[in-house]
Regions:
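Active-site neighborhoods and metal-handling regions in enzymes and metal-associated proteins
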Residues: 7, 35-520
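Bacterial N-terminal signal peptides that target proteins for export
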Residues: 4-23
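Bacterial N-terminal signal peptides
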Residues: 18-34
Length: 520
């Protein structure tokens, strides 16, 4: 079988991701030196608009958006508006988005069940069994914008579930596309009447250059089996030499980067639930408990409140046990401890959590801490205040027109001025959030209203106490909305929380468990 990377229309995606990987690796070296490369001189503010939509209004409206009383008609309108924006952004040709029924690691990070299906879910609202073996065809044309859902389910039920008027059995997809690839000039009037959709697609495509945007895999794990849709795409390309396949991510990523009020309301709810889980988990972080117990408390709260995990919850007590002198533990890899392994919390440390609930497939991403003895030591307090000051200052600068690199360089400079801690700050200032915890977005563009972002930085001296904050922020037309600010982070609030009892005390006994024996 021909490698995926060599397929026409797919090689550009591979090259683009390869370039991203090069930029990421280069960025680590740049960031360790304290600088993030500035965007090209051609970048300007405000950026060009690809569709007419008031994202500033949506960002303002999200705070009052009622997620608990949404009727089917309102949800249909939300997804119809998304499809309209995508149709408006298609520069020519058509778009075909298949549902995806397999999970893959998110860019070599972690397992998220719906990751590769999020584009289909974003446009239809369908997930799980409702989305099984389905495809969505979007065709902008002067006469009519075609939106057709092909489904393996009952067409009448799917029409009611999505509000999409044109719903066909999945078996009709291959027939429609086969007919549409015929030169439109060969069509007779009776054929046009018989196949209105293929006729419209054939006319829109023309004769010499037929563009079809398709959802290639976002993950490119070449060692894994190819998804079936790639073989279908390849058969279509062989059927017509004029057909050019392009990656739908080129259109969908900019649309998904700017959120509507429903998106932002879901992110807000995810942050709220995450805060509840963090408070309960960190209240229980006492000497003798295990990191796994803290993880499970937070995860239980998320699920009890109607959410799932945006990514695997990470709990870690610092300082870490000393490593052999020759061993370097890369930041970002030290947190993943198997839940079957009992890592006991010891007196005198600080428990750090990196966690996020996902509500209706929109993820939060928060980092917080608690002193396990109920009070920070003088050194812990000093490091905590440094990181907290940096976090507040960086977030205060968020507004439309600001670049990611400006926020990153500000954090690096402040960490450097505080005592050279920029040397150990080995990742960027943050990332977009949305349906993915590390969502799609363009980091060279200035910030715009409707973006949702996680801001993270911290003080991580080798062998010392790790203090790292992460907060979720929405960009508004007037500045920003710091939606995770109510999750305890002020020193006095955190110490007070550390001395409180968790509502889960009864599961672990009235008193903290005794410490595990010292290991070899």
């Amino acid at each position: 079988m021909q490698p995926v990377a060599n397929k026409p229309g797919h090689s550009s995606r591979v090259l683009r991701l390869t370039a991203k990987a090069f930029v990421l690796l280069s960025g680590l070296s740049i960031m360790s030196a304290g600088l993030w490369a500035q965007p090209p001189a051609s970048a300007s503010w405000p950026p060009p608009r690809h569709f007419d939509y008031n994202y500033a209004h949506e960002a303002r409206r999200a705070a009052e958006f009622d997620l608990d009383h949404l009727d089917a008609g309102t949800l249909h309108d939300i997804f119809a508006e998304r499809r309209r924006r995508v149709l408006q952004a298609i520069p020519g040709g058509a778009m075909l988005i298949f549902s995806v029924e397999r999970a893959q690691p998110r860019r070599l990070e972690f397992q998220v069940p719906n990751s590769e299906n999020h584009d289909f879910m974003y446009l239809t609202g369908l997930e799980g069994l409702d989305s099984y073996d389905s495809a969505l065809l979007l065709l902008p044309s002067a006469e009519k914008n075609w939106i057709v859902l092909y489904t393996s389910g009952d067409p009448a039920e799917m029409k009611q579930a999505t509000g999409i008027e044109e719903v066909k059995p999945l078996a009709k997809l291959e027939e429609d596309l086969s007919v549409a690839l015929t030169d439109y000039r060969d069509w007779r009037i009776t054929q046009i009447r018989r196949w209105p959709l293929p006729a419209a697609l054939a006319k829109a495509w023309g004769r010499d250059h037929k563009v079809l945007y398709v959802n290639y895999p976002r993950f490119l794990r070449l060692g894994m089996p190819e998804p079936p849709r790639l073989e279908f795409f390849e058969r279509m390309r062989r059927f017509s030499s004029e057909l050019e396949m392009r990656d739908s991510a080129d259109i969908l990523d900019p649309v998904r980067m700017l959120h509507d009020a429903y998106d932002l309301a879901c992110i807000r709810r995810a942050v709220q639930i995450t805060g509840e889980g963090i408070v309960e988990g960190l209240r229980a972080a006492k000497p003798g408990r295990t990191e796994t117990q803290i993880m499970e408390i937070m995860d239980f709260v998320y699920r009890y409140r109607g959410a799932t995990l945006g990514f695997p919850t990470e709990v870690q007590e610092t300082p870490l046990p000393p490593a052999p002198p020759a061993k370097e533990i890369p930041e970002g890899f030290i947190d993943f401890v198997p839940r079957s392994q009992a890592v006991f919390i010891r007196p005198g440390g600080v428990v750090h959590v990196d966690t996020g609930a996902s509500f209706r497939d929109h993820s939060a991403d928060i980092q917080r801490h608690v002193p396990v003895d109920g009070q920070f030591t003088d050194e812990q307090r000093r490091l905590y205040e440094i990181a907290l000051n940096v976090q507040k200052t960086v977030i205060s600068r968020i507004k439309p027109g600001v670049y990611w690199w400006e926020l990153h360089n500000l954090a690096v400079q402040m960490l450097r001025d505080a005592g050279g801690y920029d040397k150990y700050y080995t990742y960027g200032i943050g990332h977009f959030i949305g349906m993915e915890v590390h969502d799609e977005g363009d980091y060279e563009q200035p910030l715009q209203p409707g973006m949702a972002m996680a801001i993270e930085q911290g003080v991580m001296p080798p062998g010392g106490t790790r203090i790292a904050f992460e907060d979720d922020v929405i960009v508004t037309d007037t500045g920003h909305d710091w939606i995770s600010q109510n999750i305890p982070m002020e020193l006095s609030d955190v110490e007070h929380m550390a001395r409180e009892k968790s509502r889960f005390e009864s599961f672990a006994g009235k008193e903290p468990l005794s410490l595990a024996p010292e290991g070899p």
